[in-house]
Amino acid sequence: MEFTDQALAHCPDIDEKRVGICGGSYGGFMCNWMIGHTDRYGAAVSQRSISNYATKCLYTDIGYYANRLQMEAYPWEDFHKVWSMSPLSGAVNAKTPTLFLQSDEDYRCWMGDAIQMFSAVKRQGTDAKLVLFHGENHELSRSGKPENRMTRLKELEEWFEKYLKKN
């Protein structure tokens, strides 16, 4: 978020009300985190993301040790620490319209995390949309089926146009 502050300070031509964020994998995690901690962005697109470290540590192809390395704790050792580092914990504050793009065969960032974050944001009354890609995995944007890659880009473009385009 500090980067956005610096960019806006150095580039006065940027309309700060029409800045969007987008990220996939760790970038999706960061996107989820930011929408729960600031309302500065006009729209967000979260792709193949992580939202809940308490459950992620039990079902990722990275391995059972991943949470321990990232957070120095498993949920059963220090639930508060793990939960406080999970984007889902901040979803109650989400005000940014967010599109969630997720593959149903992604075993790194499972579909459940996208559904949890989408559901939590939607329940806050914030506009959100979830698009699931059947038969795709973590590599959708790079090596997915051409029709799904095109759909992904179309969804992303339409979301940003809806919320960021000048009338």
Identify what each model region corresponds to.
Residues 1-167:
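Active-site-proximal cap/loop segments of hydrolase catalytic domains
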